[in-house]
Amino acid sequence: GLFGVLGSIAKHVLPHVVPVIAEKL
């Protein structure tokens, strides 16, 4: 369902987003 798609996207996006957020903090 929709949550499955969002979860799949999150798994691909989070590894790229987390380092950027960590640098800003």
From Swiss-Prot:
Compartments where located: Secreted
Keyword Secreted on entry: yes
Keyword hit for Cytoplasm: no
Top-level taxon of origin: Eukaryota
Alphabetized Pfam families for the sequence: Caerin_1
Gene Ontology BP, a term: innate immune response
Expression sites by tissue: Expressed by the skin dorsal glands.
Disulfide bridge partners, by residue number: none
GO cellular component, one term: extracellular region
Leucine amide modified-residue sites: 25
Alphabetical keyword list: Amidation, Amphibian defense peptide, Antibiotic, Antimicrobial, Immunity, Innate immunity, Secreted
Comment field on protein domains: Contains two amphipathic alpha helix regions separated by a region of less-defined helicity and greater flexibility.
Protein role: Antimicrobial peptide. Adopts an alpha helical conformation which can disrupt bacterial membranes. Strongly inhibits the formation of NO by neuronal nitric oxide synthase (nNOS) at micromolar concentrations. Acts by a non-competitive mechanism, probably by binding to calcium/calmodulin and as a consequence blocking calmodulin attachment to nNOS.
Family per similarity comment: Belongs to the frog skin active peptide (FSAP) family. Caerin subfamily.
Protein name per Swiss-Prot or TrEMBL: Caerin-1.9
Organism encoding this protein: Ranoidea chloris
